[in-house]
Amino acid sequence: MRAQVNSPTYTGGLWRKDRAAIVDPARLVWGLKTAAMSLGVRIYEDTKATSIEKDGVGVLVNTPLGRVRAGKVALATNAFKPLLNRIGHYVAPVYDYCMVTEPLTNAQLAEIGWTNRQGLSDIANQFHYYRLTEDNRILWGGYDAIYFWRGKVNTELESRPETWAKLSKHFFDTFPQLEGVKFTHMWGGAIDTCSRFCVFWGQAWQGRVAYAIGYTGLGVASSRFGGEVMLDLLDGRRSRATETKFVQEKPLPFPPEPFRFIGIQATRWSLDREDKTGKRNLWLRGLDRFGLGFDS
């Protein structure tokens, strides 16, 4: 492993060359936007959908500036406030944070190797993920998965100095050769976590509304599949996917507050403890038994 990427923290690793790839999420979204608009799709950015309601045989979408009437609605609200109350039982908005270094010099790159430029992740419960950018910076993120009281989501929470400090320490523990390298960009964002760690689907209002949600940070790779299944459900079309147990079943719901907040904090503490000791405590074993989990 250290012949590929030189870190004193590595004792082994697995390099998957056939089923993994690195994708720039921003460029992917911009490309999808261009493709959609070329097909006649109209996109109204920064227009907040505040609620939906039944409208005859269709659906009415309310916004601060007006209303949209539609025969059917596909909901992809992610970590933001769900427009169907039932979704809120299954999804918890969790903040994930990233940092990016200044461009590395050739000498610094030589110190760490990484000539094959793989995307990397460790296998801890509270894991880190990292990759090299086109201009030889290191994007470094993960570990902290922060749930705020009552699922709070706003732009103020996208900056968290205590997380930056923690991630910075972990970075230099992993690459002590890079001590002194500066971080030039830091940000955070909310993801839609559910107890089974991957997307789930549902319908409402006699099939007029369908949703795909709960990607738990895996949406860049799987949202195309999630969207296709959601559209099949919305059209009432049976497919191989819609007939599977995976699509038809939902994750176990999270408990209401304050038990949701307390439970998530207890789970984070327990996961961190397992990463340090290698032992899974009674709390985590209980969650395993009931098929519950928490992650980013």
Where would I find each of the regions flagged by the language model?
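Flexible hinge/switch segments at interdomain interfaces of large molecular machines
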Residues: 2-9
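Short amphipathic alpha-helical face segments that pack within enzyme cores
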Residues: 27, 31, 166, 221-229
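Helical element adjacent to the flavin cofactor pocket in flavoenzyme catalytic cores
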Residues: 9-72
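Active-site substrate-recognition segment that forms the wall
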Residues: 49-51, 57, 67-107, 111-207, ...
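C-terminal lid/capping helical subdomain adjacent to the catalytic/cofactor pocket in oxidative enzymes
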Residues: 205-210, 216-296
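General small-molecule cofactor/ligand-binding pocket signal
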Residues: 2, 42-44, 182-186
